[in-house]
């Protein structure tokens, strides 16, 4: 089974790029799940095309803006997460075989553009974004 999620960190707020509502999500940690983003949607995917479609969908709503250096500059950090699970059966000869689940997680990270304010001439909203990017 493969699941995918896509989030952005913009102005110190985490949001789900695959949901229509833009609520601020929280990072949590527990013994079973480790570090996770509470409320982040997970989408079951079966093909590379489905993965690419989710990436495109999230990229369309990601925070971007024009600067003097780039026509389209990402203003948020983004993380595309893929979780792969594999279930195997242990010793099939037993009447009650135990199951083993292997989990792999891949985080694809795209960091926000951090152009120098002096070079880009950022003011107003762009200047406030620059302060929070790093």
Language model features by range: what are they?
Residues 1-134:
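P-loop NTPase "switch/coupling" elements that transmit nucleotide state to mechanical/effector output
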């Amino acid at each position: 089974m493969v699941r995918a999620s896509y989030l952005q960190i913009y102005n110190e707020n985490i949001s789900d790029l695959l949901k229509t509502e833009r609520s601020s999500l929280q990072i949590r940690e527990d013994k079973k799940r480790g570090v996770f983003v509470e409320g982040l949607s997970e989408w079951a995917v079966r093909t590379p095309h489905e993965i690419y479609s989710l990436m495109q969908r999230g990229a369309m709503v990601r925070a971007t803006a024009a600067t003097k250096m780039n026509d389209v500059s990402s203003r948020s950090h983004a993380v595309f997460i893929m979780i792969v699970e594999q279930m195997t059966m242990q010793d099939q000869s037993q009447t009650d075989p135990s199951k083993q689940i292997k989990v792999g997680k891949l985080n694809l990270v795209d960091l926000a553009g951090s152009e120098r304010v002096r070079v880009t001439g950022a003011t107003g909203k762009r200047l406030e974004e620059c302060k929070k990017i790093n």
